[in-house]
């Protein structure tokens, strides 16, 4: 009889706990996906900023108008004005 109790406890309590995903586990995947999209957008802005930096004055004019990510423009402005 004790063997039956142990096996029932394992299959009815421990097995479902090990196989079910909690809400916290599911939301972590969603946030990781959102961060990945943000990284891709930041990469696009950085790439565009570096391409504009090669053209010179066009980059300075556009960056003064505003940028979605100010840190790339401020850093690039600092680099171009120090020359």
Curated annotation (Swiss-Prot):
GO terms for molecular function: sodium channel regulator activity; toxin activity. It is found in: Secreted. It comes from the Eukaryota. Residues 1-20 form the signal peptide. Keywords: Cleavage on pair of basic residues, Disulfide bond, Ion channel impairing toxin, Neurotoxin, Secreted, Signal, Toxin, Voltage-gated sodium channel impairing toxin. Authors of PubMed:25600641 studied the activity of this peptide with the C-terminal Arg residue, which is probably cleaved in the native peptide. Residues 21-54, 76-83 form a propeptide. One of its GO terms (cellular component) is extracellular region. Expressed by the venom duct. This toxin inhibits both the TTX-sensitive and TTX-resistant sodium currents in adult rat dorsal root ganglion neurons. The inhibition on TTX-resistant sodium currents is stronger than on TTX-sensitive sodium currents. When intracranially injected into mice, the toxin induces tremors (50 nM), spasms (100 nM), and death (200 nM). The cysteine framework is XVI (C-C-CC). Belongs to the conotoxin M superfamily. This is Conotoxin Lt16a.
């Amino acid at each position: 009889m004790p063997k039956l109790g142990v096996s029932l406890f394992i299959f009815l309590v421990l097995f479902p706990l090990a196989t079910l995903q909690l809400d916290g586990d599911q939301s972590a995947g969603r946030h990781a996906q959102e961060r990945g999209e943000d990284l891709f957008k930041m990469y696009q802005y950085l790439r565009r900023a570096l391409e504009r930096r090669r053209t010179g004055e066009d980059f300075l004019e556009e960056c003064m108008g505003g940028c979605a990510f100010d840190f790339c423009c401020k850093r690039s402005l600092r680099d171009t004005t120090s020359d």
